[in-house]
Amino acid sequence: MKTIVVCSGGLDSVSLAHKVAAEQQLIGLVSFDYGQRHRKELDFAAACAKRLGVPHEIIDITTIGKHLTGSALTDDVDVPDGHYAEETMKATVVPNRNAIMLAIAFGLAAAQKADAVAVAVHGGDHFIYPDCRPGFIDAFQQMQNQALDGYASVSLYAPFVMTSKADIVTDGARHKTPFAETWSCYKGGERHCGRCGTCVERREAFHLAGVEDPTDYEDPDFWVTATSGFSAQEVK
């Protein structure tokens, strides 16, 4: 199956790229510059494409992104510290982000005669990101079936949608994903902060998976406090 992977450069999507390269026919990676403050993640996506020997496209949608106001990822709003399940983490939502990116990715896939678009949404995203939940994935596939009817048949491959980030770490280790060559931190500094929701989830995932975390965090122990009182199980 010829597959294009939507790759941000983060742990999840880079692990997915390595999985697809091992199990399917990976024909390229596509990334999106939407004006995110952690744009450095795109460098890690480019490195992944080079490592796997496939083309890499960075689609500039900053003109769209600047209109999706109110998010800590694109606006002058502080990125909150803590666990993803906390109410404050809603500040990291970029409205309709995945729907916009996937619509473009499906267009690319149809033009390139690909069979599938792969996306690394996972169970840990369900807390606050509605466009990462199973209902969205199913509905998007149905919509694309109509949008491309008679022209192309492209499947949405989301193998992690019902699994935890710890499961992704386990799967990534199996496919020899170089975790040190991935970027998660929403703050986009020189090092992973260790305090934002995605850093906390990343650190916890390695712990739960029993896999050594090679990440250099500014605050490597904050995750313990942040995760106390929260279950790693997903909100379905």
Swiss-Prot record:
GO terms of molecular function: ATP binding; ligase activity, forming carbon-nitrogen bonds; zinc ion binding
Its EC number(s): 6.3.4.20
Record carries keyword Phosphoprotein: no
Cofactor, free-text remark: Binds 1 zinc ion per subunit.
Residues that bind ATP: C7, S8, G9, G10, L11, D12, S13, V14, S15, L16, A17
Cofactor: Zn(2+)
GO biological process: queuosine biosynthetic process
CDD domains membership: QueC-like
Keyword tags: ATP-binding, Ligase, Metal-binding, Nucleotide-binding, Queuosine biosynthesis, Zinc
Pathway: Purine metabolism; 7-cyano-7-deazaguanine biosynthesis
Top-rank EC class of the record's enzyme: ligase
Pfam families, alphabetized: QueC
Binding site for Zn(2+): C185, C193, C196, C199
Segment forming the signal sequence: none
InterPro entries, alphabetized: QueC, Rossmann-like_a/b/a_fold
Record's catalysed reaction(s): 7-carboxy-7-deazaguanine + NH4(+) + ATP = 7-cyano-7-deazaguanine + ADP + phosphate + H2O + H(+)
Family: Belongs to the QueC family.
Function statement: Catalyzes the ATP-dependent conversion of 7-carboxy-7-deazaguanine (CDG) to 7-cyano-7-deazaguanine (preQ(0)).
HAMAP family documented for this protein: QueC
The protein, known as: 7-cyano-7-deazaguanine synthase
Organism: Rhizobium rhizogenes (strain K84 / ATCC BAA-868) (Agrobacterium radiobacter)
